[in-house]
Amino acid sequence: MFGKGGMGNLMKQAQMMQERMAKMQEEIARMEMVGESGAGLVKVTMTGAHTVRKVEIYPSLMEDDKEMLEDLIAAACNDAARIIEENQKAKMAEVTGGMQLPPGMKMPF
């Protein structure tokens, strides 16, 4: 089924891909993305590991409706998480050469 050394080469390629994925995951975890809502009135800085580092709120919002502010903060967090997911997919495509993971399968395996 596998030619001479074929299985060994396949295993070596799999190991190399695994190492590249681990490095990519470390890079993503260190990255910081900024999500926004309310046309930039609320900004959330989040790491690739989904840790919120900073929340910025335009001063005039502090005097406005509390419920609206809560919604804007949640929307900014969701925007940052979406940006992180997009970056993870792009980085994964670099590592896998564009090969898509099966539906429902996420990194790390």
From Swiss-Prot:
GO CC term, one of those recorded: cytosol
UniProtKB keywords: Cytoplasm, DNA-binding
GO molecular function: DNA binding
InterPro entries associated with the record: YbaB-like_sf (IPR036894), YbaB/EbfC (IPR004401)
Main localisation: cytoplasm
Record's subcellular location: Cytoplasm, Nucleoid
Keyword Cytoplasm among record annotations: yes
Keyword Metal-binding tagged: no
PANTHER family membership: NUCLEOID-ASSOCIATED PROTEIN YBAB
Role played: Binds to DNA and alters its conformation. May be involved in regulation of gene expression, nucleoid organization and DNA protection.
Subunit structure as annotated in this protein's UniProt entry: Homodimer.
Family assignment from sequence similarity: Belongs to the YbaB/EbfC family.
This protein's name: Nucleoid-associated protein SO_2014
